[in-house]
Amino acid sequence: ASVVRAAGSEVNGFSVGDEVWHSGNRDRPGTYSQFTLVDSRIVSKRPPSLSIAEAASLPLTALTSWEALIDHIRLGTPEERSNKAFLMIGGAGGVGSAAIQLARAITSGPVVATSSRPESAQWCQDMGATGIINHREPLAPQVNDFGITGFDGILSAYTPPASTLAEIIAPFGHLVMIDGTDSFDLMAFKSKSLTVTSESMFSRPQFATPDVAEQGRALASIADLVEKRQIRPTMTRHIEGLTAQHVREATAAVE
């Protein structure tokens, strides 16, 4: 989250002084800089109700969730809500927190999250999860207890074996993974005609894809959901001031 200090002659929609947000491009330095140069197509006006620190907590996780749920899974949209069932594996993390909120905004179906500790389960419920299952226990019996025959979409931050997921995903369902895995047996998915996708929200800016401007439009939609109080920031700690010591402190806290 930042303020526009200068804009190129071909930039449309932004002026000096605009309060904006973006997640940047990992091939372009500037994360810890006072100023950074960014492609205007991956930027939008930030929600006026948020502080700059609160706004900074959302773009990366919210864009990852948007691309996973809307671009890949096609769970629904803010304008056309569905009734599909969604599971977030790893619900208490940054992406999980954003994905639960976004899912509640685009589907009327069950939004279930996995968690293993009471405090993280409570966090997921605070984010809007309609059900919690323990990922340290067998998943299928817990899913059956909710009366869910299969999830239309699953977003996974900690992907379990394919055979485990094949039991709980609906035919023609969609799995999106944001983690890395050494091996994944796709044959377990064949009988249900399932789709598997990996997700990195940096792909569009990194490779300058023809639809790179979708990222700016997604951020504008996310900002609208924030103003409608359907998505809230997930910041739990604020270290004030851009100094070398604070950068080290914040990095250590994340690690």
Regions found by a protein language model. Name each.
Residues 31-32, 115-123, 183-186:
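Short, glycine/polar-rich helix-capping loops at beta-to-alpha or helix-loop-helix junctions
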Residues 15, 48-51, 74-85, 149-150:
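Short helix-loop-beta connector
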Residues 27-40:
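A structural motif shared across PLP-dependent enzymes of the aminotransferase-like
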Residues 211-255:
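C-terminal hydrophobic helical "lid"/dimerization subdomain
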Residues 77-81, 127, 131-199:
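Glycine-rich cofactor phosphate-binding loops and adjacent beta1-alpha1 units
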Residues 56-137:
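Mid-domain Rossmann-like dinucleotide-binding core that forms the NAD(H)/NADP(H) cofactor-binding site
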Residues 1-27:
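Glycine-rich beta-strand-centered segment in the early N-terminal region that forms part
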Residues 21-22, 87, 155, 176:
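Hydrophobic beta-strand signal
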